């Protein structure tokens, strides 16, 4: 008679167990490859932090800023570059890894096995989000050493920040999926991804942290996925007693639940579109059910 332990090991895995195992495998593999890729680590972690240091050293004259505002100004600047780093991870590093797998013929093998496209997508996205958090955290950590100041607005602010950050990341990682499919050459995919990141960052005023650089209607900064995500994080991470007198206005702060709901909606739509893309294009299967 089999023992209880043997029975537990011999029990067949359910569909959910298999799906979770596949998700975990893709997450671990993707994160490992991110960390092994020196170029990805440089562009995603070192470059944003260095860009922040260069900016405050050469382009921000703190002698003209009231002493009590210097920490805030550095915090705003760092937050913009932190989200820039997260964007580099979600678009450039994520697309680059997927292009490598497509180019190496791995998907010819994946299509021949019962691999769940959603497990593939969510596993990669979990690794991408984790790496993006590291990139963001490094910039914020470096900024604290330079005198940047932060303050949580409310007890629930960490949860809001996490949701906003993940929704922001989800949108760009799904964009990266379609970039990888459309541009299967790693070199060109990298050039396009970095170009999109840079244009997005600067044309929207450091992802919405410097509205004066944004040429269109400032109200759009509370609607666009990259700027809305950044501004929600800023609202809950910076000690801004009056947004009307700060560099973050106009527009008004994204303080309402509607702004967070819009971000969550962006993330949900991105996941749906990404799932369909993985099924129909990457895995060449039917519609997901």
Regions found by a protein language model. Name each.
Residues 56, 231, 235-289:
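Alpha-helical transmembrane segments of multi-pass membrane transporters/translocases
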Residues 125-193, 198-200, 260, 271-272:
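Alpha-helical transmembrane segments and their short interhelical loops
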Residues 10-13, 76, 87-92, 123, ...:
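Short alpha-helical transmembrane interface motifs in multi-pass membrane proteins
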Residues 34-63, 75-90, 135, 193-202, ...:
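Hydrophobic alpha-helical transmembrane segments of multi-pass membrane transport/permease proteins
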Residues 54-62, 180-226:
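Transmembrane helix segments
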Residues 66-97, 164-181, 272-275:
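Hydrophobic alpha-helical transmembrane segments of membrane proteins
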Residues 1-42, 50, 64-68, 82, ...:
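Haloarchaeal acidic low-complexity proteome signature biased toward cell-envelope/secretome components but also
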Residues 74-147:
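Hydrophobic alpha-helical transmembrane segments of multi-pass membrane transport proteins
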């Amino acid at each position: 008679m089999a023992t209880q332990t043997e029975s537990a090991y011999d029990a067949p895995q359910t569909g959910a167990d298999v799906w979770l195992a596949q998700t975990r495998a893709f997450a671990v593999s993707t994160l490992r490859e991110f960390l092994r890729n020196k170029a990805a680590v440089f562009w995603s972690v070192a470059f944003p932090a260095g860009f922040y240091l260069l900016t405050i050293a050469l382009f921000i004259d703190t002698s003209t800023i009231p002493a009590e505002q210097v920490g805030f100004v550095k915090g705003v600047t760092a937050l913009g570059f932190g989200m820039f780093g997260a964007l580099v991870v979600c678009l450039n590093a994520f697309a680059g890894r997927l292009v490598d797998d497509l180019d190496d013929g791995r998907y010819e093998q994946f299509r021949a096995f019962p691999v769940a496209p959603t497990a593939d997508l969510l596993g990669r996205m979990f690794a991408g989000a984790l790496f993006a958090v590291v990139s963001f955290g490094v910039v914020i950590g470096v900024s604290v050493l330079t005198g940047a100041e932060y303050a949580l607005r409310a007890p629930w602010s960490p949860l809001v920040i996490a949701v906003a950050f993940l929704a922001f990341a989800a949108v760009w990682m799904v964009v990266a999926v379609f970039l990888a499919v459309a541009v299967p050459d790693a070199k060109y995919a990298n050039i396009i991804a970095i170009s999109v990141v840079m244009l997005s960052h600067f044309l929207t005023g450091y992802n919405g942290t410097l509205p004066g650089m944004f040429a269109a209607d400032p109200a759009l900064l509370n609607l666009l996925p990259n700027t809305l995500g950044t501004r929600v994080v800023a609202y809950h991470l910076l000690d801004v007693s009056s947004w009307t007198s700060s560099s973050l206005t106009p527009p008004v702060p994204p303080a309402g639940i509607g702004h967070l709901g819009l971000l969550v909606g962006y993330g949900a739509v991105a996941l749906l579109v990404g799932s369909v893309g993985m099924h129909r294009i990457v895995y060449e299967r039917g519609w997901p059910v």
